[in-house]
């Protein structure tokens, strides 16, 4: 797909360090190109997806993964929500998905800020690196860069965490971490 439909991103794809980064980048590229919905395999739908399509009015839709985060990369910009990437919807060629892709290509979060995040976060440095380069911290930074225009955030709450708003439940937060080996997809 990348070689034939979006060859300008192939070099970025093959140089991502971890397989999970390649998977993240691939899903953004496919959704940008075709439009549609991405759901991790552990997302249980509570309503038919038609409801999402009718409610979004050509907006991108992403979940708020958590409120009141402490990652200084984000909080220093007066923003405290973490936007998840385990489920999202976008019409084709949406500029917010393009913002995410561009931020991956140019490594929007600097290596210095990644090192600071690795020192502050309790997760292993390799996982924090993924959060900052293709995962939720990168998506959140992209949202801050882009602004709220045409992006609908579906909130969760303390009583019902890990929700894709009213659409679904994300059951296994961080399940990718179990087998996070530095293999690449070619």
Tell where the protein language model's regions lie, with residue ranges:
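Small-residue hinge/turn detector
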Residues: 24-36
């Amino acid at each position: 797909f990348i070689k034939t439909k979006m060859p300008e991103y192939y070099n970025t794809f093959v140089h991502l360090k971890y397989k999970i980064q390649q998977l993240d980048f691939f899903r953004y590229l496919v959704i940008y190109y075709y439009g549609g919905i991405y759901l991790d395999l552990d997302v249980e739908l509570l309503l038919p997806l038609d409801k999402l399509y009718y409610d979004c009015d050509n907006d991108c839709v992403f979940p708020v993964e958590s409120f009141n985060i402490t990652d200084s990369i984000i909080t220093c910009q007066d923003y405290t929500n973490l936007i998840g990437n385990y489920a999202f919807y976008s019409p084709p060629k949406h500029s917010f998905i393009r913002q995410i892709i561009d931020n991956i290509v140019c490594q929007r979060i600097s290596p210095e800020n990644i090192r600071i995040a690795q020192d502050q976060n309790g997760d292993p440095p390799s996982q924090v690196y993924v959060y900052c380069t293709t995962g939720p911290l990168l998506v959140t930074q992209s949202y801050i860069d882009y602004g709220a225009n045409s992006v609908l955030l579906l909130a969760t709450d303390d009583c019902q965490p890990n929700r894709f708003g009213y659409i679904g439940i994300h059951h296994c937060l961080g399940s990718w971490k179990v087998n996070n080996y530095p293999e690449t997809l070619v």
